[in-house]
């Protein structure tokens, strides 16, 4: 089971926690190929990767083959790292530049980007795609998208694996994922296919693997506040039903501690607020604590609230 790239979330700490729970692979947040070329502030920070994270995919976004090639070459000597090219991001500011899911509209250029990366990287290059640009229900009946053809083209261009988010760009993250498309792509390719979309639990992951024939299953949003999902994948007996408030509090303390080491108290404090909300989602009587966490002004104050969460039931 694989941790998806999550903008603003899948930093080194989150990847480490996922790995400790059993994730076989994780991805960085999206890294701009142009940002690497122009040395944009903050871009290098996204490439902080610790060996304890296990194998990590650096997810590049960009639509210019020469920029993708530059970024891939820059990463070639990084150990335990593969290169992934984002062809699925639906966000308008990315799409308007011809990047992310807009690359589905120019398959030939997408293939050139893969070829450029594969030539320079000296390591596996993968692609994360969607199953089309238009279509509210995962299918555009009037103008069906040839997602199998696109995936095949990526394989021919040198992709070592293809991750498929089984939604269109128009769907963003809503509506039902079209697992049938994952099955069709899995049937057509000789390289591994990673299925993604509507994997909300370890049981969903097992079902996707069985129903689609994909090689690996990727989850993203389901891991927010629940890094244990990877442990449940490896061991069906590791059910969340047996997880106590104390277990959740302990994980939050570790998460916050690692964030402080990586980013310093202030940045860690701001970042941990959203994670506290995810960790305590569905926990009875947690609403007031969440409100207090969102106004916490120091690391010690936040730790006090995290410890208090251990007493909730």
What are these regions (language model features)?
Residues 1-313:
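Flavin-dependent oxidoreductase catalytic cores
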């Amino acid at each position: 089971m694989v941790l998806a790239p999550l903008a603003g979330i899948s930093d080194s700490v989150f990847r480490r926690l996922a790995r400790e729970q059993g994730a076989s692979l994780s991805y960085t947040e999206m890294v701009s190929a142009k940002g690497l070329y122009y040395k944009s502030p903050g871009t290098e920070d996204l490439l902080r990767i610790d060996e304890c994270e296990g194998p990590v995919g650096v997810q590049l976004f960009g639509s210019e083959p020469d920029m993708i090639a530059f970024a891939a070459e820059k990463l070639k000597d990084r150990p335990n790292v593969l290169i992934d090219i984002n062809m699925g991001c639906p966000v308008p500011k990315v799409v308007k530049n011809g990047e992310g899911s807009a690359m589905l509209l120019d398959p030939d250029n997408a293939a050139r980007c893969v070829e450029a990366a594969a030539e320079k990287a000296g390591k596996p290059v993968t692609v994360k795609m969607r199953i089309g640009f238009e279509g509210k229900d995962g299918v555009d009946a009037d103008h069906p998208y040839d997602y199998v053809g696109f995936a095949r083209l990526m394989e021919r261009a040198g992709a070592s694996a293809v991750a498929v988010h089984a939604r269109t760009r128009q769907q963003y993250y809503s509506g039902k994922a079209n697992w049938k498309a994952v099955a069709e792509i899995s049937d057509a390719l000789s390289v591994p296919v990673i299925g993604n979309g509507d994997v909300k639990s370890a049981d969903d992951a097992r079902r996707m693997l069985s129903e689609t024939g994909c090689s690996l299953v990727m989850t993203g949003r389901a891991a927010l506040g629940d890094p244990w999902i990877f442990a449940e994948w490896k061991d069906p007996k590791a059910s969340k039903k047996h997880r106590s408030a104390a277990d959740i509090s302990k994980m939050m303390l570790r998460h916050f501690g690692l964030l402080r080491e990586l980013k310093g108290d202030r940045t860690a404090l701001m970042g941990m607020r959203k994670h506290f909300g995810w960790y305590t989602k569905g926990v009875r009587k947690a609403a007031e604590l969440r409100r207090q966490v969102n106004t916490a002004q120091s690391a010690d104050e936040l730790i006090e609230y995290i410890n208090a969460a251990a007493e909730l039931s």
